[in-house]
Amino acid sequence: MFCKIQPSTETDLLHILELNKAAIPAVNLLNEMEIQNLFLQAVYFHSLWLNQEVIGFLIALGPGAIYNSPNYRWFELRYDQFLYIDRIVIDPSHQGNGFGHMFYDKLKEFAGQKKIPRITCEVN
């Protein structure tokens, strides 16, 4: 089993849309334009690969994103530096194997390297 987390590419986006669709209602539906917009604005947009297949992704935004979310705006009004986790999705057939923890650990490592003091999110 070969597993790695790496920055997503534009070629990953269609598969990421399918994973996102499978995760509804835990996340909201996205179309191609919306995922492309997130891809361009995200500070952290990484995919989880298992045996040459994308099985998950995590998207985090920083301050200054053009993003129509009252939850994101709440953090932006209060903090100069933060990462806002927009969504984390793991393929249902691979949930419960610690992949979410791996993503959060990688995001914490990223935040530490960039000296970003807080990671925020909305909880459904």
Show where each model-derived region lies:
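Conserved acetyl-CoA-binding loop-helix of GNAT-fold acetyltransferases
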Residues: 90, 96-109
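Conserved GNAT acetyl-CoA-binding A-motif
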Residues: 111-124
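Conserved beta-hairpin
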Residues: 44-58, 62
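Conserved acyl-donor/pantetheine-binding loop and adjacent beta-alpha core of acyl/acetyltransferases
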Residues: 59-87
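Glycine-rich phosphate/pyrophosphate-binding loop shared by adenosine-nucleotide-utilizing enzymes
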Residues: 3, 53-57, 83
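A short beta-loop-alpha structural element at the N-terminal edge
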Residues: 2-16
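Helix-loop element at the rim of GNAT/NAT acetyltransferase active sites that forms part
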Residues: 18-31
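Residue-level recognition of the GNAT/N-acetyltransferase active site
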Residues: 86, 91, 124
